[in-house]
């Protein structure tokens, strides 16, 4: 009989025979054992239904319902256990004095520490410090320049003149408000420059 014309049963028998020969004749530890694949039986399907529903016997339905009930009961039990553990954790936190605010602040502090410990943050802080030092040096150099000192003195004298004018105007208005019945005129005090 040619090889291509063998029936499936004959092929299966030959494979089993070959596997037995391998198991019996080879004593090496690395020998390959060929096992026959297990085939799961297919459940009958109702071909008349367009939704391809699986048809189950009453015993299978009862078994599935029992398993569903057990699973739902386990879920309920786990929810109760979780709730009890959460209450216990809340009680322990209360005894330790941990409030939601303190937990939040601890989380923020931990996050900040994590960020400040990174290389990127360290490098950025170094660059910012160097930039700050450079700006301070430039500012001091500018303040010590003759142009800045000249501008500062002119601005200071203009400010003093404005204060003196405002003071004189207020004194003049105060004198006018007193009226002619009072003897003498108010003497304008000489404004002292603010230094």
Swiss-Prot record:
Residues 45-54 have a biased composition (Polar residues). Keywords: Coiled coil. Residues 1-54, 173-195 are annotated as: Disordered. InterPro entries: TPD52 (IPR007327). GO terms for cellular component: cytoplasm. It holds the Pfam family TPD52. Residues 7-20 have a biased composition (Basic and acidic residues). This is Uncharacterized protein F13E6.1. It comes from Caenorhabditis elegans.
